[in-house]
Structure formats: C-alpha cells, structure tokens
C-alpha cells in the first residue's frame, strides 16, 4: 500500500512597507521664486516618486537577504521591533566555518554537502561575498587540489574554484552579493550597510531562494478594480496636499513578504 508524502501548508501575512516625503512650504516658495531655472534642483525636488519607490524596493531586498542569510527577518524601525522566524532547522544554521589559509575548508564543505544529502537535498548553489571567495582562493588546501603541491601560494581564479566545487560537490554556482544601501540615523547622518553579510555562506537546494511575494496594497486597491496592468504593479505611488502647512506629500507603498519555498533546504 502506497503512502503520500506529508502535505505542508504555510500561511504568510505580507507586510506593508511605506515611505513618504513632503515638499514643504519653503521648498515650494523656492520653486516659485525661480529655482525652476536650475535643472539639478528641479530634479532634486521633483524626483520624490523615484526616490520613495527605490526606498521601498531597497527595504524588500534587505528583507530577502536577511532571510537568506539567517533564516529570519528582523524588523527594528519606526518603533516596531519583531522577528519573523521561517523555521529553518537549527542544525542547518549550526556550521561555523574556519576559512583561514591552513584550514581544511574542503572537509568542512563536504560535511555540509553530506548533511544535506542525508536530509534528502542536493545543494545546487552557494551564495556569499567576494571576501569569502577571496579566502577560498587563498586557502592552501584548495590551491594544492587545483595546482598541485608546488602550486601553494597561487591565487585560484573564480572559474577554477567553480570547477573544483562542481567536481567535488556537484555544484559550480557560486553567487556573490556585495551591494550596499544607506540608512539615515537619528542624528541625520547616513550609515552604509550590506544587503548580505560579508562573512557568511548560504547553501541552497531550491532554485527559488531569494524570492518574495507581492500583494495588493490598500493604496493600489483604492485605484480601482484589479486589471491586467495591476499584475505588473508592485509599488504604488500616491500624492496628496495638506492645506496648513501647505505641503505636497509623495508616498510609495508596497505589500511584500520574503518567501522560503522549503525552510529545510
């Protein structure tokens, strides 16, 4: 008698992400007093839509990379502090790799691949930073495997590293993510952050890792019935005016949640 695999159903609630800014009375007076002659200032003042939309998009990317690197999404902004746990097994997060030049990196990676296989998964990609890739390329054990005993000290090019991974572990896709974004601190100064940590490696067995689920925000719903164009509308821009103080507000809104198709792999 046959049996069906256990059916797993996951329910997620998408998070509303908003960013807004206003054209103050002072800005509007400057514009009406002839600032419009300076194209750079005009772009600075009236590029609010793109800037706010980019801010929402960046926040979704931060959320995705947070989940990809930790199995959790951490929120600590606008007086809201919470953690969304995606249920990644603790044993999948317990590896502390030694990436020094003399370390047995290949043995450590083989242990990860073997554990994934024991759980029924085949790793097909490693996601990391260029800093980690450079450490792999300067590891003596990896250099010896590629160039022989006389090749220690020879830097390993990325294509040779991918070839070695493909031969030993069955996957040759090593994706690096080193983009950065800026946030504004309470004192008005800016801080630069990485989307993906520079000292981590994420091994995946499903091709959909790093994706997210978009939904219809309240602002988008206010525009009317869902239609064909709505299918390609992820971030909604709205504008409105306030009488006192006189200001024009621009707001970008998106409804989004990162998705892990299979937290175990």
Residue ranges and their predicted role:
Residues 1-31:
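Assembly/oligomerization interface modules of large self-assembling protein complexes
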Residues 25-47:
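Active-site-proximal, glycine-rich beta->alpha crossover segments in alpha/beta enzymes
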Residues 52:
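RNA-binding accessory domains that recognize and position tRNA/RNA substrates
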Residues 61-78:
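Short, glycine/acidic-rich hinge or "gate" loops at secondary-structure transitions
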Residues 81-157, 164:
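Extended, solvent-exposed, turn-rich assembly/linker loops in the middle of proteins
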Residues 143, 147-265:
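Sequence/fold signature of self-assembling virion shell proteins
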């Amino acid at each position: 008698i046959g049996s069906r695999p256990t059916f797993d159903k996951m329910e997620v609630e998408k998070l509303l992400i908003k960013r807004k800014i206003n054209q103050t009375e002072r800005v509007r007076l400057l514009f009406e007093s002839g600032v419009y002659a300076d194209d750079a200032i005009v772009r600075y003042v009236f590029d609010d839509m793109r800037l706010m939309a980019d801010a929402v998009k960046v926040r979704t990317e931060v959320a995705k990379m947070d989940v990809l690197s930790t199995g959790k999404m951490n929120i600590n902004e606008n007086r809201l502090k919470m953690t969304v746990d995606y249920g990644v097994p603790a044993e999948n997060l317990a590896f502390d790799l030694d990436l020094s030049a003399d370390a047995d990196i290949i043995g450590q990676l083989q242990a990860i691949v073997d554990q994934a296989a024991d759980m029924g998964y085949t790793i097909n990609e490693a996601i990391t930073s260029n800093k980690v890739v450079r450490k792999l390329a300067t590891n003596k054990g990896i250099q010896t495997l590629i160039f022989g005993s006389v090749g220690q000290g020879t830097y390993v090019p990325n294509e040779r590293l991918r070839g070695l991974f493909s031969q030993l572990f069955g996957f040759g896709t090593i994706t690096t993510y080193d983009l950065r974004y800026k946030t504004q601190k309470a004192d008005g100064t800016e801080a630069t952050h990485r989307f993906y940590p520079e000292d981590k490696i994420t091994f995946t067995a499903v091709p959909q890792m790093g994706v997210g689920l978009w939904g219809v925000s309240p602002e988008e719903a206010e525009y009317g019935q869902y239609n064909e164009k709505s299918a390609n509308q992820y971030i909604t821009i709205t504008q409105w005016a306030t009488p006192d103080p006189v200001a024009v507000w621009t707001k970008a809104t998106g409804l989004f949640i990162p998705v892990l198709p299979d937290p175990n792999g």
